[in-house]
């Protein structure tokens, strides 16, 4: 579904990580074991990294330019 360096959007809030739905991130690693998941780095409006954590495919959507 996604590959490394794809720009993605969080589909839901992750308050424990200070991420809100609609926040933009970049896939930095793809996992297949034990489940398909993606390590995503999220940034703020100025481009500063905010959080990095793994998400399941249904928690992300592609960012449309």
Please state what every model-predicted region is.
Residues 2-64:
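Basic/aromatic-rich interaction segments and small domains that mediate binding to polyanionic partners
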């Amino acid at each position: 579904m996604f590959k490394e360096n794809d720009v993605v959007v969080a589909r839901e809030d992750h308050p424990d990580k200070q991420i809100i739905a609609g926040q933009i991130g970049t896939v930095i690693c793809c996992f297949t074991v034990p489940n398909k998941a993606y390590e995503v780095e999220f940034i703020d409006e100025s481009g500063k990294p905010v959080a990095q954590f793994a998400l399941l495919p249904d928690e992300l959507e592609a960012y449309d330019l």
